[in-house]
Amino acid sequence: MGLLILGLGNPGLEFSLTRHNVGFSLLDKIVSKNGLFLKRKKKYEYSELKMISGRVILVKPLTYMNLSGSLFPSIFSDFYMCIKNLLVVLDNVDLPLGKCRLKERGGVSTHNGLRSISSVLGSSNYSRLYIGVGSNLMRDIKSFVLSRFCKDEMDRLEKLYDFLSDELIDISEANFKNKVQKINSSNF
């Protein structure tokens, strides 16, 4: 089995290290931790790991998050993958900072990146990893997800990214349920 990990975020330095870009940040951690580098295609950057369980393709879209679906279906054919190989990594304001939720499939809720992907694929039958970015009821949601983390929050997230970078690269169909339990019970 192969795995295509799609980290959601917005391109550009102004969005770097914002709450909305935790998908990008996690993929950057996996890339650096494994001594890889990102290559550039027309609509995305990618890197590839070869694991015992199969290839792991890491993808960062060069489109804005709300247009993430525009990568499909061509990205599947570029890497000989299909929807069952897809794992989308994204932010979630309903989870506390440092908490994760790995799901085999689910709805699109209010996340525009998921909505875009599901609309193009005609299905929401793919895995996703939600990374909690906390919430601030005093600010509007758009301003909040586009805000940067403070130093204490970044320190916690770095520990989480380190943990997740080890856990995600060897996910397979055989161990998915165990990974769900381990990742979902973690808290950083």
UniProtKB/Swiss-Prot annotation:
What this protein is reported to do is described as: Hydrolyzes ribosome-free peptidyl-tRNAs (with 1 or more amino acids incorporated), which drop off the ribosome during protein synthesis, or as a result of ribosome stalling.
Q: Which domain of life is it from?
A: Bacteria
Q: What catalytic reaction does the record list?
A: an N-acyl-L-alpha-aminoacyl-tRNA + H2O = an N-acyl-L-amino acid + a tRNA + H(+)
The UniProt entry annotates the active site at 20
Q: Report what the protein is called.
A: Peptidyl-tRNA hydrolase
Task: Provide a GO biological process annotation.
Answer: rescue of stalled ribosome
Instruction: List the InterPro entries.
Output: Pept_tRNA_hydro, Pept_tRNA_hydro_CS, Pept_tRNA_hydro_sf
CDD domains xref list: PTH
Does the UniProt entry include the keyword Hydrolase?
Answer: yes
Site (Stabilizes the basic form of H active site to accept a proton) found at: 91
One annotated GO molecular function: peptidyl-tRNA hydrolase activity
Which NCBIfam families does UniProt cross-reference here? pth
Q: Where is this site: Discriminates between blocked and unblocked aminoacyl-tRNA?
A: 10
Asked if the Swiss-Prot or TrEMBL record annotates the protein with the keyword Metal-binding, the reply is no
Question: Self-association or partners: how does it assemble?
Answer: Monomer.
Q: What is the gene called?
A: pth
- Record-annotated residues binding tRNA? 15, 64, 66, 112
Task: State its Enzyme Commission number(s).
Answer: 3.1.1.29
Cellular component, GO, one term? cytoplasm
Where does this protein reside within or beyond the cell?
Answer: Cytoplasm
Q: What is its main location?
A: cytoplasm
Q: Which Pfam families match?
A: Pept_tRNA_hydro
**What keywords appear on the UniProt entry?**
Cytoplasm, Hydrolase, RNA-binding, tRNA-binding
UniProt lists the family membership as follows: Belongs to the PTH family.
